[in-house]
């Protein structure tokens, strides 16, 4: 079974830039507010892109997905390698949505300016393996997300409302 080998993220929510090398099992631990939920959110974003639900995910609020909003970060990028496959995209804010500044399968450019992935459209034409939601490797991706919501959790403590960074 193939697995995601690496994922590179730029400009997604609290993640300015990150590159992760993944193994068969990955455990991510962090304090509340440290960005662990946003890291998991990248996999949700990827799933929404690959299943043609990006615009539902954006929900007319692209700034909530961009690192400190479009004034600071006008676009976000995600690059994934999975065995011999590679897939990546850059999404930029345009009015109340995100559109593909580019989308690529390996080194092959799929397109620009579209609102939903065109990956499945190129699958029959591509000489290279195509990363798409129907492939068995995506069926084995499982994400479990646990929260500390106990009474002593930092999320339930009094905080300075002006401390937003």
Walk through the language-model features, giving the residues of each:
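N-terminal pre-Walker A segment at the start of P-loop NTPase domains
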Residues: 1-15
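Hydrophobic residues positioned within well-ordered beta-strands of beta-sheet architectures
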Residues: 5, 18, 76-78, 87, ...
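Short strand-coil-strand connectors
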Residues: 10-14, 81-83, 106
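Phosphate-binding P-loop
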Residues: 17-23
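Hydrophobic anchor at the beta1->P-loop junction of P-loop NTPases
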Residues: 28-30
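Conserved lysine of the Walker
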Residues: 35-36
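Conserved P-loop NTP-binding catalytic core
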Residues: 40-96
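Electropositive, glycine-dotted interaction segments
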Residues: 83-165
């Amino acid at each position: 079974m193939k697995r995601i080998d690496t994922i590179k993220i730029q400009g997604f929510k609290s993640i300015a830039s990150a590159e992760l090398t993944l193994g068969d099992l990955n455990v991510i631990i962090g304090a509340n507010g440290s960005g662990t939920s946003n890291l998991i959110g990248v996999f949700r974003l990827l799933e929404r892109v690959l299943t043609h639900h990006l615009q539902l995910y954006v929900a007319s609020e692209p700034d909530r997905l961009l690192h400190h909003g479009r004034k600071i970060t006008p676009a976000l990028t995600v690059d994934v390698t999975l065995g011999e496959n590679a897939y990546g995209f850059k999404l930029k804010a345009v009015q109340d949505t995100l559109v593909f500044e580019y989308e690529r399968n390996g080194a092959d450019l799929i397109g620009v300016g579209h609102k939903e992935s065109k990956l499945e459209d190129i699958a029959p034409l591509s000489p290279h393996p195509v990363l798409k939601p129907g492939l068995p490797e995506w069926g084995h991706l499982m994400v479990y997300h646990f929260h500390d919501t106990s009474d002593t959790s930092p999320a339930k403590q009094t905080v300075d409302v002006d401390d937003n960074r």
